[in-house]
Amino acid sequence: MQPPRRLDSAQQMEEPMQTDAPERSRASLPLSQLLTLSIYWLGIQTIWGGLNITIIPGRLDDLSRETQGTMLAIIMIAGAVAPIVIQPTVGVISDYTVTRWGRRKPYIVIGALLDVVFLAGIAFSNDFVALVAFYFLLQVSSNFAQGPFQGYVPDLVPAKQVGTASGLMGLMLTLGTIVGVGIATLGGITDQLPLATLALGFVEVVTMVILVATVDEGRAGPKRTRPWREIAMSAWARDILEQRDVLWLLLVRLMFLGAYNATLIAIGYFRRSQGLSDADADTIVFVATAIVGVSTALAAIPGGRLSDRFGRRPVIWTAGLIAAIGLVGVTIAPNPAFAVGSWIPFGIGMGLFLSADWALMADVIPKETAGRYMGILNAGTAMAGPVFIIVAGPIQDLTAAAFGDPVGPRVAMAVAAVFLGISALALTRVDPRRRELGDGALVGSGA
């Protein structure tokens, strides 16, 4: 049995005119290495799944049920600022970084360790202002790591395996959500929520160590001919306006992932719209999250391969339709069982989307500065929750005040379905053909 090929991005990421071997000639990577490249997603999503779905909404609901939606919007807005600025900026800096450990690893290690510090702040915060402050700082540190980390797929994965790598990423995100919500739910049941919050960070650090210890990314990046300040400022330079497909895809991701953030109001939905007690609502949200997770996982791997065969856009359109059916079911559900069952098509749609979406991102970005553009596109992920809550949160509170408490969360679920429709329309403007390294050539059909 041959030893696994070492992952070396240095040969792939020189300046465009100096690249000898085209990207499409890379040898295939073993499944074990694709898993290694994806494992850190599990750690990242463990934190955000546990916080955003269970811990933060539950704590805000305890502070003030009447204004929970508005407070959630405030904390999400505060959290959105950091990803928009930090992720593309640190991503493009890492594109040009040269260290003995490689370009991306130093940022990943620093970000993951700081995550634990700021999670401790969240765990022991006793008021809303402190909670917002530490949530913002956690977004800063997490995105300090995520921006460079997202450059790995375009750096290291050959074009023919991007769909599979994207599916594995979707799987890890799903597993991370299940693990995070499971830890948070257990912490709530045992009245050990601060300890559970710290445990989220422990899981992330473990996955970070696995990633850093097993991936050899090489040391060299493109030759730096500009000062670091100029490179950092270039993250959102005006040349991004020339990348119309990247901008449209940013809107696609913003809307689709915004709909996914309907899970943020699941606690309030089951407490208020379905009339469950706090303890029962927490338990059923974990069950619903597990169902969504399993459905997403089952769809993620085949979704990536289906997108390789039939094209990225058809798979994403199908994903949107299936997820919308699930959201409509949740909106009109007459009882908790019907609502939980409706999360199944929602999860399937999300799994298909996550696999095809990541592959489409890797296809359309300019490869010379992958960290920059993956960071920009992932700003859609960072902004998705805040944008959804900014829209759906006040609508939830207003409709609840006008038509009764149970109505608000149902209307917010319907807003998520509208987001999916907007995403589908925006996708029609994205040219899905693959861009190769160096010459900007478009490869393949327009599926």
Region spans (language model):
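Helix-loop boundary and gating motifs at the non-cytosolic
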Residues: A21-A80, D245-V252, F256-G275
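Intracellular juxtamembrane helix-capping segments at the cytosolic ends
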Residues: I56, F144-V157, F353-P366
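Glycine-rich segments within core transmembrane alpha-helices of 12-TM secondary carriers
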Residues: P83-I84, G163-T185, N378-I389
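Helix-to-loop junctions at the C-terminal end of transmembrane segments
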Residues: I86-W101, A299-G311
